[in-house]
Amino acid sequence: MNNAAVSLIEAVVETAVYAEDLDQIERFYRDVLGLNVIGREPGRHVFFQVGNHSVLLVFNPQATLSGGVFPAHGARGPGHFALGVRSESLNNWRQWLTDNRIAIEKEVSWPRGGASIYFRDPAGNSVELVTPGLWGTPAGW
């Protein structure tokens, strides 16, 4: 990038996925994955804090088609996102998911380092728990 007036993008601040049953999604992300709810509008969205720097936005896909305060948006089919966890906690997460009857879809050990566990949320979105090393980036992920 050659424009000195524009700084480098530093982070993904929000990630959005879509689900029709927001009550079920709220229970899953709050009670199973331990995320804190930071915003809710019944029938439209539920938002979760992820770590110190990002937010997971879950929208009812029908409620965002026409726009409003935000531009219209949406997606068809399941989405995917990854949540970072410490390497030493991956076995505990595997057991926690099993104890909560969450089917593990796939496990991967990555060539650069890091490992991932994939599973689905109640809306069918692919959720990945990943340990540092996956991308070999300075931040560790």
Q: Whereabouts are the PLM-identified features?
A:
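Vicinal oxygen chelate
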Residues: 1-8, 11-20, 49-51, 69-141, ...
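Short beta-strand/turn micro-motifs at beta-sheet edges
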Residues: 2-4, 66-71
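Structural motif
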Residues: 4-7, 30, 73
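Core segments of cupin and vicinal oxygen chelate
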Residues: 18-63
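Short beta->alpha connector loops
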Residues: 41, 63, 88, 110-112
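A generic structural signal for short beta-strands and their flanking turns/coil linkers
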Residues: 44, 54-55, 77-79, 100
